[in-house]
C-alpha cells in the first residue's frame, strides 16, 4: 500500500512539475524568444501535434487521434499500476503516468504538446522535448531494467514482501 501512495505522489509531482515547467517556458519564450542556455542546449518553442519526434503531426485529426491513444495508454498503465505487486515497478509506472498525463493535458488545452528543450552539437539537433518526455523515457527505462533484473531471472517472493525478491539459483 505504501508503494501505491508513493506512486500516486510520483504521478502528481511529475504532472505538476511538467505543467509548471511548460508555463515557465511559454512565458520565457514570449518575452525572450529562443535562448541558448548552454552551448549544446537551447530553450525553443515547438508545438508538437504528432507523437515522438513530431511523427504523424501532419495527419488530419492527429490531435484527436493521439488524445484517444494517450487516454487508452494511460488507462492501461493505471490498471497495471493498481495491479502491480512490485513496489519499485509501481513507482516507475507512476512517473510514466505523470508524464503521459502532462502531455495529455497539453493536447486537451492547446491541441498540441508543448516542447521547449533543444539539444544540439554542431549540425546535429535532437528533436525538442519537455519534462514529461524525460519522465516517460526514464520511467520506461527503469521499469524495463526492473523487469530484466527481477522477472527475466525467475525471481521468487520468499517473504511475501514485493521488495524482498530473491533470484532463483539454477
Curated annotation (Swiss-Prot):
NCBIfam families: lspA (TIGR00077), PRK14775.1 (NF011357). It is a multi-pass membrane protein. It comes from Anaplasma marginale (strain St. Maries). Its main location: membrane. The chain crosses the membrane at residues 5-25, 62-82, 89-111, 126-146. This is Lipoprotein signal peptidase. GO terms for biological process: proteolysis. It catalyses: Release of signal peptides from bacterial membrane prolipoproteins. Hydrolyzes -Xaa-Yaa-Zaa-|-(S,diacylglyceryl)Cys-, in which Xaa is hydrophobic (preferably Leu), and Yaa (Ala or Ser) and Zaa (Gly or Ala) have small, neutral side chains.
Amino acid at each position: 500500500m505504501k508503494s501505491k501512495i508513493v506512486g500516486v505522489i510520483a504521478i502528481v509531482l511529475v504532472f505538476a512539475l511538467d505543467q509548471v515547467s511548460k508555463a515557465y517556458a511559454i512565458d520565457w519564450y514570449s518575452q525572450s524568444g529562443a535562448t541558448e542556455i548552454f552551448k549544446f542546449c537551447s530553450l525553443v518553442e515547438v508545438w508538437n501535434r504528432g507523437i515522438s519526434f513530431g511523427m504523424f503531426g501532419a495527419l488530419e485529426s492527429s490531435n484527436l487521434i493521439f488524445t484517444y491513444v494517450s487516454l487508452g495508454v494511460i488507462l492501461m498503465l493505471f490498471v497495471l499500476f493498481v495491479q502491480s505487486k512490485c513496489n519499485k515497478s509501481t513507482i516507475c509506472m507512476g512517473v510514466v503516468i505523470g508524464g503521459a498525463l502532462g502531455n495529455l493535458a497539453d493536447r486537451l488545452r492547446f491541441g498540441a504538446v508543448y516542447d521547449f528543450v533543444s539539444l544540439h552539437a554542431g549540425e546535429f539537433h535532437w528533436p525538442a522535448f519537455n519534462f514529461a518526455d524525460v519522465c516517460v523515457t526514464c520511467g520506461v527505462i527503469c521499469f524495463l531494467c526492473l523487469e530484466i533484473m527481477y522477472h527475466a531471472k525467475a525471481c521468487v517472493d520468499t517473504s511475501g514482501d514485493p521488495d524482498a525478491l530473491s533470484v532463483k539459483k539454477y
